[in-house]
Amino acid sequence: MISWIKGELVSSWQANNKFYILVNCQGLGYEIQTLESVFFDINSNKISEKEIILWLKHIKKEDSDMLFGFSTKDQRDFFIQILNIKGIGSQIGMSLLNKFSLNQLITAISNNDKKSISTVQGIGQKMTERIILELKSKVINKEIEKENLNINNFLEKNKDLDSIFKDIDLTLQSLNYSKKEIKNLFPKLINNIKNSSLEKESISFENLLKEAMNYLDHK
């Protein structure tokens, strides 16, 4: 299976609101349907024609063999999730990612924004509802994973804070707050620290615990 490609641009063209590039990789020419944003980045020299790197999804059918190319792995993986929804094909997936950035699409799905999603050509009300139903829990879980990774990375670089947060976690659990409540709280505290709404000298176990309980009691 082809996961990504690195090569040199041979040509690019547009047909019926679809965007294509031909990439030379070690003497072989790969025809790839790509996103409008990638197409225009290449043609405006924001992406070097000499070294194009794309994440790929290879779709093989009885009557066709197609490659779809994306600038990031997250885009490619989201495209694959869209394809796993019954009744939705590759062109609907490309249309969604052409209409919205990945973050915009995730936000629309998370917020049940049927109006925005249904503005994509070829997507009606029922398909919009199916997309939200199938993907909402997945995109929310993905965002939670990303947020947790950011928290872990931040605390890894700030060992003193890491120790304080572990103590806060244990203290709040002893006060019968649930693990879920505590987990949802930590990003708020860390954002306050990052945004400097907390003065450096006030970052202590006592002050952070007080702020944590204030959040939990007024949520």
UniProtKB/Swiss-Prot annotation:
Residues 161-219 are annotated as: Domain III. The keyword Cytoplasm applies. One of its GO terms (molecular function) is four-way junction helicase activity. Residues 151-161 are annotated as: Flexible linker. Residues 72-150 are annotated as: Domain II. Residues 1-71 are annotated as: Domain I. It comes from the Bacteria. Pfam families: HHH_5, RuvA_N. GO terms for biological process: DNA recombination; DNA repair. InterPro entries: DNA_helicase_Holl-junc_RuvA_I (IPR013849), NA-bd_OB-fold (IPR012340), RuvA (IPR000085), RuvA_2-like (IPR010994). One of its GO terms (cellular component) is Holliday junction resolvase complex. Keywords: Cytoplasm, DNA damage, DNA recombination, DNA repair, DNA-binding. It is found in: Cytoplasm. Homotetramer. Forms an RuvA(8)-RuvB(12)-Holliday junction (HJ) complex. HJ DNA is sandwiched between 2 RuvA tetramers; dsDNA enters through RuvA and exits via RuvB. An RuvB hexamer assembles on each DNA strand where it exits the tetramer. Each RuvB hexamer is contacted by two RuvA subunits (via domain III) on 2 adjacent RuvB subunits; this complex drives branch migration. In the full resolvosome a probable DNA-RuvA(4)-RuvB(12)-RuvC(2) complex forms which resolves the HJ. Belongs to the RuvA family. The RuvA-RuvB-RuvC complex processes Holliday junction (HJ) DNA during genetic recombination and DNA repair, while the RuvA-RuvB complex plays an important role in the rescue of blocked DNA replication forks via replication fork reversal (RFR). RuvA specifically binds to HJ cruciform DNA, conferring on it an open structure. The RuvB hexamer acts as an ATP-dependent pump, pulling dsDNA into and through the RuvAB complex. HJ branch migration allows RuvC to scan DNA until it finds its consensus sequence, where it cleaves and resolves the cruciform DNA. HAMAP family: DNA_HJ_migration_RuvA. Has three domains with a flexible linker between the domains II and III and assumes an 'L' shape. Domain III is highly mobile and contacts RuvB. This is Holliday junction branch migration complex subunit RuvA. It comes from Prochlorococcus marinus subsp. pastoris (strain CCMP1986 / NIES-2087 / MED4).
